Amino acid sequence: MVPREQAEEAIVADSNGKEEEVGVMGVSAGEHGADDHHGGGGKFSMKNLLWHGGSVWDAWFSCASNQVAQVLLTLPYSFSQLGMLSGVLLQLFYGFMGSWTAYLISVLYVEYRSRKEKEGVSFKNHVIQWFEVLDGLLGPYWKAAGLAFNCTFLLFGSVIQLIACASNIYYINDRLDKRTWTYIFGACCATTVFIPSFHNYRIWSFLGLGMTTYTAWYLAIAALLNGQAEGITHTGPTKLVLYFTGATNILYTFGGHAVTVEIMHAMWKPAKFKYIYLLATLYVFTLTLPSASAMYWAFGDELLTHSNAFSLLPKTGWRDAAVILMLIHQFITFGFACTPLYFVWEKVIGMHDTKSICLRALARLPIVVPIWFLAIIFPFFGPINSAVGALLVSFTVYIIPALAHILTYRTASARMNAAEKPPFFLPSWTGMFVLNMFIVVWVLVVGFGLGGWASMVNFIRQIDTFGLFAKCYQCPKPAPALAQSPVPLPHH
């Protein structure tokens, strides 16, 4: 087995070769295949600046912008269910736990890729995905589990972005109901089929994070300026169902690394990804903690019936700007969630190595249709996050990576020949295994068990209250018009 340094060099070499050869990734031969070009020694072009992203910074922007998105608007709702102290502590707890499992995924990717490269396998015209890593390291049953959970999570992750688009635009233009806006934004988001891979999200990731940063600080400042209305109460937590629903939404918030492998594969040096997700999470804390805390302080228990933070803030130009920027970012995040699904579908129908972007876009369109349909059936912005977090995120990005790491390195020979040794802050294999088992047990019991129970109770309650295919979820009821009949003229 190649040691860690050689494994990294092998990965870099293959990545560069891939970028020179794969036109479908948006990079042509000789354009910037050499590593010294990526370092700044080659010819500058606007196309490279905006379209070809594979640096450490590109990966950081992708992770940070993909992680926060629309959950920024539902975290105040979660704080009202949890209370201030639990809300802050659980954000920190799940943020660091998510960073650890993202690290495990990156280690397993490097292990899989270094083994395959030693066997002479080429990844030209092929994007490695998480289920393929599981297949290569642990066999077909793990591949099936990874494929099922990952694809279902990404499917509903895309659904959530579409629901959020309709929910947000309603606060600018309420002449159309949220269901109609879902139809419109479903068509708009379908244009993501033309973006070949994560390699081509450079400018979008940068803009997306900037937009989310504006929205987060708008929420915090607007809430503080609004102040506490008279009679505001902060009673959370009051019910176990609400508590674990809120906790699971936070688990969902910091479980956005279902696309980690695809982001790594788009890097010029994938082995440098290890701590990027942690650094992205630290930045995300500066957005989520102030905004959620300020909103809960200002509005308290009112948030229990307002899952979208925008709904409680006064309509101003600042709010409209935040809504518009969040809409654009949700379009970007929709693409992030859908792109791995596009890859899977391409591989199923044999179109993954097709070089024509238009043909691939046409082949991808069937993926958008079920997303569109599900967003119309379940328009429950907020509660759906918790349900997806408990039933899908708990396995996809917490339990499966932790178990996969334990089983991959369960033998002494596997540990001795590992492409990545334990990190400096936890230099013991035993320590890593103990931490992994803690994550498995915690998420299985608290996230999937209690969180699943609470989230499904809350989700079913939304169906009972609003019904499937709800036309305008949580929209304010129009004031009843006073029927004023004309006064009859006296007869003479």
Curated annotation (Swiss-Prot):
- Look up and give the membrane topology term: Multi-pass membrane protein
Q: Does the keyword Cell inner membrane apply?
A: no
- Its main localization is membrane
One biological process term in Gene Ontology: amino acid transmembrane transport
Q: Which residues lie on this side of the membrane: Cytoplasmic?
A: 1-67, 109-143, 202, 262-274, 344-364, 408-432
The record's annotation in InterPro entries points to: AA_transpt_TM
Q: Which GO terms describe its cellular component?
A: membrane; plasma membrane
Q: Which residues lie on this side of the membrane: Extracellular?
A: 86-87, 165-180, 224-240, 296-322, 386, 454-492
- Keywords assigned by UniProt, alphabetized: Amino-acid transport, Auxin signaling pathway, Cell membrane, Membrane, Symport, Transmembrane, Transmembrane helix, Transport
In alphabetical order, the GO MF annotations are:
amino acid transmembrane transporter activity; symporter activity
* Protein localization: Cell membrane
Q: Does the keyword Cell wall biogenesis/degradation apply?
A: no
Q: So where does this one cross the membrane?
A: 68-85, 88-108, 144-164, 181-201, 203-223, 241-261, 275-295, 323-343, 365-385, 387-407, 433-453
The record's annotation in PANTHER family points to: OS05G0424000 PROTEIN-RELATED (PTHR48017)
Function text = Carrier protein involved in proton-driven auxin influx. May mediate the formation of auxin gradient from developing leaves (site of auxin biosynthesis) to tips.
The record's similarity note reads:
Belongs to the amino acid/polyamine transporter 2 family. Amino acid/auxin permease (AAAP) (TC 2.A.18.1) subfamily.
Task: List the protein's name.
Answer: Auxin transporter-like protein 1
